[in-house]
Amino acid sequence: MADWLLLIPWNKIFTAACGCFFSDRNYIHKMEANLDDLHTTMEELKNGRDDLLRRVSIEEDKGLQQLAQVKGWISRVEIVESRFKDLLEDKSTETGRLCLFGFCSENCISSYNYGEKVMKNLEEVKELLSKKHFEVVAHKIPVPKVEEKNIHTTVGLYAMVEMAWKSLMNDEIRTLCLHGMGGVGKTTLLACINNKFVELESEFDVVIWVVVSKDFQLEGIQDQILGRLRLDKEWERETENKKASLINNNLKRKKFVLLLDDLWSEVDLNKIGVPPPTRENGAKIVFTKRSKEVSKYMKADMQIKVSCLSPDEAWELFRITVDDVILSSHEDIPALARIVAAKCHGLPLALIVIGEAMACKETIQEWHHAINVLNSPAGHKFPGMEERILLVLKFSYDSLKNGEIKLCFLYCSLFPEDFEIEKEKLIEYWICEGYINPNRYEDGGTNQGYDIIGLLVRAHLLIECELTTKVKMHYVIREMALWINSDFGKQQETICVKSGAHVRMIPNDINWEIVRQVSLISTQIEKISCSSKCSNLSTLLLPYNKLVNISVGFFLFMPKLVVLDLSTNMSLIELPEEISNLCSLQYLNLSSTGIKSLPGGMKKLRKLIYLNLEFSYKLESLVGISATLPNLQVLKLFYSNVCVDDILMEELQHMDHLKILTVTIDDAMILERIQGIDRLASSIRGLCLTNMSAPRVVLSTTALGGLQQLAILSCNISEIKMDWKSKERREVSPMEIHPSTSTSSPGFKQLSSVNIMKLVGPRDLSWLLFAQNLKSLHVGFSPEIEEIINKEKGSSITKEIAFGKLESLVIYKLPELKEICWNYRTLPNSRYFDVKDCPKLPEDIANFPMHAEE
């Protein structure tokens, strides 16, 4: 019994009892009054908190950050409010225990403890109320130096990132341009560069990322910069000039990095307010774009081309995207997957989109179907192709300056996949189609064509080939062009492109009444027997086939046909007379065919301005051509079986509209005479000397100023001399002139290709130094040639490195050749080099590197 009494907390009972009657705080007696007071003050506190939260929200909308003391006060209010709710739950129980008019309780200890909590909560609420007045509730957020970007994958980008980063960290590089075709990974590369600045936070004050977009406004760029700098939101209502001033005042005190993603045209950084990057301020600017054009205006210190992935890198990205689980679901799928990946030609965007589409395909039938779709003219129908690839790439097309340039670009899609298109041939097509100026003078259509090709290459819509005389299209860009050309897939029947497919005969699925352009290049077609009404057909491309015969009725109903290309059909020996029905025809290419004569019906082709008969190895005569085709502007007879004689030369003089001419000549006297007829000589672009025997041949650099191609085949010529002063007509050997010091700068400035085969007589070809811009040189089967360039003669002509612009050099079957050129061991621009069967040529010369850096 005594032990039980000892367990009673007599001290608390005593304290509580005293508190009931004698304590100043009267926790029990004042319980109800304190609860009422707590309820009132708590409501006031919550209202104060809500008012403060509204103020904080307004300031945060301005880009400011809540003060820590404000955040702490609000947090304390939340805690007090939670305690208040707990007290309210026990209120009825505790107030129900009160007795003796509230001076005592049925459970004094419980009531005492509860009353104490009420009092302390009330005191804390009153304390918080006394501190609720804040003059300032938020402050400016410290600007993070780098905002890290999320990156999907960096497969194949490591080397490019390292190269770009190394270049950017060079003190001499203040502005860096990353250019490449759409979808190639420029934004990902820029994001990698952005994230690398995390490692250099101490060296730069701020890294700013701006998305420029195609239809950018200066204010839009300014707003992104100001937002990144966390300046007060009052700037939103400011003028463009005021915003520029705010940006300039902020950045001129900082070592900043500006990353501009996706530039489409020149951006005036001065108008935006961005200080120019200098060595003094340490600033850097990097921008990405699809065309090299902008980098010129933005004054980039360095340009880096972002190229497509290598085959191995492309496969790795595709494999990761598809996932190994799918690839291992059937033993044949990996091989099929590699075929699908190869169709993307290393374009990361295509690899990711097509890879994601195939990531759920577990059967070989699905993979075979994917390959069939990608190989078909309806490749744009592949899942995700239109909305995620073609629409992205279309921005590059939309940025082209005008409709004519867009038409020129779309025309390139008529050629087979990976087909290398001759620039000159492409321009001829464009001119005859009417896309560009038909004027063929020095400042006319041809130059305009090269300008357009350059623009398309810089926009990464065309790719310059290894030999710069050719261009080609990336597979996905070609798909985009075909998609646009068919009105975004809505009118596929208006364009028929089956180039590269082995169809052997004209496809039956061509809707001849609707189709506008038909391209059946390299399709192995052997004969054409159909005869359909082709009311809208304007372009018919049939080169690189095996045509033997064209039916009589084929050309009967093609009133709008403008371009007809039958070239490189070696077995085609005649054309039907019904070709006379092609009343709109302007372009006819019969090069590399077995045509023996032109049909009489051609005299009705009054609009024909272009006729190509080059490499026509069976052509017998062109008698009467001036009367038959009086409006010809271009006549090409390079490597033709028809050589210029007095009769043909007379005919050519009567062709008043002739502006471009290529010829084959086998008589030195004819060569001399034609050079004396200024109008004919100045129009010659290609000259083939064949089966010619003469003690010497004189070439006038003035008369033949437009010469671009020269071939010397099976000739016995002891000496080739230059005539470089047209008025004095003085013949000179190479040793008599030094073009680098001559005021008249003699030489064949346009000559880019020379082919010499079976030349007997000369021991050297030093006169080639007069072709300062030579790009391609082929020399073979010439038994007496000992040097390409003789040291004594060459040094008298120029002190510069020979063949500085040469891209292709092929030398073979020259048994006496001992030296190529005395003053070089590199070809700075060489892309193709081959030496064979030249036993006396020193091995170190025969195997010298193509590029100086090698």
Curated annotation (Swiss-Prot):
Keyword vocabulary terms for this entry: ATP-binding, Coiled coil, Leucine-rich repeat, Nucleotide-binding, Plant defense, Repeat
Domain of life the protein comes from: Eukaryota
GO biological process: defense response
LRR repeats (start-end): 514-535, 536-557, 560-582, 584-605, 607-629, 631-652
Free-text domain note: The LRR repeats probably act as specificity determinant of pathogen recognition.
Function of the protein: Probable disease resistance protein.
UniProt similarity note: Belongs to the disease resistance NB-LRR family.
Name of the featured protein: Probable disease resistance protein At1g51480
Organism: Arabidopsis thaliana (Mouse-ear cress)
